[in-house]
Amino acid sequence: MGNILKCFISCFDGEDEDGGSGHGRFPNSYPPVSSLHYQPLHLDDLQVPLSPPPPSTRQQQPPPRPALSRLHYQPLRLADLQVPLSPPPPSTRQQQLPPRPARPLGYHHGVLWPTIEITPCDDFLNLEFTTKVCEGPQHHSTPSRKTDLNRCIHEKDDGNSKPSYYWLTKNKDNHVVTPQTKRSPRPPSGVAALERDLVDFTRTFEVPEGLAQHVTSPMQAQVTWYRKLLAAYKDIKYPPKESADAAVLVAATLRGIERTNLEGILAFYGFPIPTISKEASENHPSSIPKGVLFVLKTLPVNAKCIVDGDGFTAYVDTLDPIELRQDCNASCQSRNSKKQKLWDKTAADLQISLENTGQKKMFFGGREILARKYEIRLRGIDAPEIGMQYGKESQDALVKLIARKCVTLHVYGQDQFKRFVCDIHCGGVFIQEQMLVNGHAWHFKNYDKRPQFAKWEKMARDARQGLWAYDNLEKPWEWRKNKRKASRHHNSDVR
């Protein structure tokens, strides 16, 4: 056994001596690992070109992307294109709309530029604008600033000259700047001077220079006068063209001021002192009637404040003085001392009531004012209540007479409901007279014995005007009496 192993080991020893040639006793044997020599494989020694490994399934789907470094981008030039470019197909909305035409001259944002025709204005402070659209494109230059035609004024007082116009230019902050057109100088006197001063007052709220030399009242009172004159000019249908007519308008509007101040205003404009005819003085006397304690000038009456045909709510500027009628006081001087003391006490109590009424802030004439509130009852008449037949018609009649107008109140006193009992005058019209003549109210004989009131009521009854067209119409004082009885009877049943 030992000999066999020895022979087997000697065979491997002879193979090592062979140098690894593989030609020993065992030709099919491999040389040992230590005798192998490895060399790197060079691609140049290969006779067959190598092929890349087969791509995976995911890599076969997209095509191979070229390297970015090999791409060269050049700008597209229209000259290199042989086929003319066509616009992209329009959207569904663009296919429905017709093609928009080019904007011609005279259009602004696709809309015809309107032309404003300025027509001569014969009525003071009543300028109207007529705007129409041109039939075709017109050449218009776009204005650089917004201009407003403010007012028209008459240059002369002869009535034959054409009115002139001026514009007020506003900047981006809506502030009035220098007018574009040069204004003519102010006339020294006459109707044209008064109208020019009223136009300037609407812009500056300042009275004309030189007026203080003719009047004695303070500046606040002068501003109040011109506010009343401006409101009177806007209310009248035909403005005065002669100095005499303008003097009557000024005297009627400023009737409550002192006579020296009224004469000073008339002298400032060169107006004559007006004389009132006998017919006018019969119904509308220049002097305050007997029994009037105070005179008040109201702000424009709101139509919603007229509750029925004989009552409404009025507001009076707190800057307007409450004028005590000195002539009534003087008439009482000749009487005995008891009546004089009674009149003084009544006037003092009424003045306290006038001054202690509620106040409210209001806008008038472009400024904020503080006004007193007064509940007014028309003296001497009684109109149907709203719940009665012909009550709404009577209320509408009073609305047409005084709504949006300034009225003059002749205060006689207060009734049991703390309302101020007054005669009402508006634009030279006695309101109670109009209500009675047209049949919108009854003469309240229990509280007023004036004979002209009975005369005006008889005229309406004979002509069957207003409420007199109805037969057996219930009187308002009887209606109120029956209503009070029904209320007392209902209260007794409840108890």
UniProtKB/Swiss-Prot annotation:
Its EC number is 3.1.31.-. Ca(2+) binds at D310, D382. Binds 1 Ca(2+) ion per subunit. GO terms for molecular function: endonuclease activity; metal ion binding. A lipid is attached at G2 (N-myristoyl glycine). Belongs to the thermonuclease family. Enzyme that catalyzes the hydrolysis of both DNA and RNA at the 5' position of the phosphodiester bond. This is Probable staphylococcal-like nuclease CAN4.
